[in-house]
Design a protein with these regions (language model features):
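Carbohydrate-active catalytic/glycan-binding domains of CAZyme proteins
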Residues: 1-337
Length: 337
């Protein structure tokens, strides 16, 4: 399978990729070396700004343009550090960058910055999105124009601080059956316990999805859990190597919704499929085997008549896990038939 390192002159990761006009835009996080200690909370991932890259033509061959810094942590009034993953969506000719960063209390939230152009620069809102938490936003625009944000990441991403509230048993039919009750108690658990030892036979902690407001600046509803189920329709367990850990991505093909994600400490990218944006999503397959480096994070896009997987690894940095490099590879169309 052909692959390519997209931007070998700098360390970037966590690519969110979209086609605006006839050009493909890549919104990565921007890795840097700070000497911070390695830990399970990701303290060594000290990113402070975002760039945008773009190309036109075959991603395996086309020249990649770096449009420079589009947002720096010093521009964001509420954020102190760790500008982790981000994504961009277009609505009515404006571009909305949704990003994750830590506030001055050490808590991750999602923020929004706005631009008139896909290459930025982006102007941040003064405050984070009300009720937002954790990391790794993916912003998906459905065919009817509704915009959804998928988010969440365990361990350093703090998702384990939050617990879903009572929801109906997952059903593979009908958009309205899942998440009809408030799905999360907003705000960190009082003791902020990092439960890294969830029993293997307990349901896996889910990511979340929320519909965005018409102005794309706030949540329009309470976040709902994204439930991934097995072939019997049962939620995946915490001990399943295919359960969710971080790095949500959503795309649509042939009328179906494909939720892909990283499994974290089992180091896989996996694919699940559902019939509506809220899920549940039935586990389908592994997309990518473990790469060099601890994390694996991606996006999937159709461009130039093919499906492409954008991701990262740590081969160029000799396996320094917080210095990652962007890659691209084609995917088989049969995955989404």
């Amino acid at each position: 399978m052909e692959t390519r390192y997209l931007f070998p002159s700098d360390y970037m990761a966590d690519p969110s990729v979209h086609v605006f006009g006839n050009r493909l835009y890549i919104y990565p996080s921007h890795d840097r070396e700070t000497g911070a200690a390695f830990d399970d909370d990701g303290g060594h991932f000290q990113m402070r700004d975002y760039h945008v890259l773009s190309l036109s033509g075959n991603p395996l061959e086309a020249e990649v343009t770096d449009h420079g810094v589009i947002l720096d942590v010093d521009q964001v009034p509420w954020a102190e550090k760790q500008m982790w993953d981000n994504d961009v969506v277009e609505k009515n000719g404006r571009y909305y960058l949704i990003f994750s960063a830590k506030d001055y209390n050490g808590v991750f939230h999602l923020g929004v910055a706005v631009s008139e152009r896909p290459e930025g620069p982006f102007i941040p809102q003064e405050h984070p999105i009300r009720g937002s938490f954790s990391i790794d936003p993916c912003v998906f625009k459905d065919d009817d124009g509704e915009i959804y944000c998928y988010f969440g990441g365990l361990w350093g991403g703090q998702l384990q601080w939050y617990r879903p509230g009572p929801t109906p048993k997952p059903s593979l039919e009908g958009r309205g059956e899942v998440g009809s009750e408030p799905a999360v108690s907003l705000g960190p658990a009082p003791d902020k316990v990092t439960d890294l030892l969830c029993p293997a036979d307990a349901p896996a902690l889910p990511s979340f999805v929320v519909r965005m407001s018409d102005d794309v600046l706030q949540f329009a509803e309470a976040p709902r859990p994204v439930i991934i189920v097995d072939e019997k329709g049962e939620p995946l367990k915490a001990g399943d190597p295919h359960r969710f850990f971080e790095a949500s991505w959503m795309h649509k093909a042939n009328g179906r919704y494909y939720f892909s994600y990283s499994t974290g400490d089992s180091h896989l990218l996996c694919l699940a499929v559902g019939d509506n944006p809220y899920g549940p999503f039935r586990f389908k397959c592994e997309l990518l085997q473990p790469v060099v480096g601890w994390t694996t994070h991606h996006s999937i896009v159709r461009y130039e008549g093919r499906w492409w997987l954008f991701h990262h690894d740590c081969v160029p940095s000799n396996d320094i896990t917080h210095l990652r490099s962007l890659k691209v590879m084609p995917l088989d169309d049969k995955l989404f038939e």
